[in-house]
Amino acid sequence: MPHFRPFLGLGLANYEEHQVCAVAIGVVGDICRALEGNVLPYCDEIVGLLLRNLQNPALNRNVKPPILSCFGDIALAVGGNFEKYMQVTMSMLVQASSTAIDTGNADLVEYLNQLREGIFEAYTGVLQGLRADDKSGAFEPYVMGALDLIRQVAEGIPSGTTSDEVLRAAAGVVGDLGSSLGARGLKAVARQSPHREYLKALLKEAKASSNEQTKQVGVWAHGTLFAPP
């Protein structure tokens, strides 16, 4: 990794050739899965480059979803050590969640689905990484940000523009939130209006999906929040 690091950094910084940048982002994910916690010494540089790209208005928009997903790969690899990057990462996820599009434009609808899937993959990696090191409580300040995107997805279901991949990813985050923070009051939040309504609507749609994997995730997530104690 020390010998490869400079080339990886050059690839991540090469926003002008977005395909090169996208490949470098994919390599980061592979490195995280291979090295796991041993990737930690390189995370300051990697996270810094990823954040810089997200803030760059010249970056090709198609690179943003894999960047967001990459934060989940990093968090899953380093576990509780991701806590130092939480504030800035969560801020970026919330900012990306506010992206609005013309739903009559098929290309933009596809992009929004990819963006949301990347955001949910980031949330999943962070939640699972923290839980592995018994640091789930570090996510508590950011629960409402995640729930707001889940609400947006649930409210968009009737329009028919939400992909099954996004539905499954959203349901997965609901399940991860319930598994990680249920004892700290998320179940109580989920039973309150308006959270109860959109969470149940989303999970009902997931459980009714023709995709077996989405259906299973929906059933599991529903159980983490609404199963009797």
Regions found by a protein language model. Name each.
Residues 1-229:
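Karyopherin-beta/Importin-beta family HEAT-repeat alpha-solenoid scaffold
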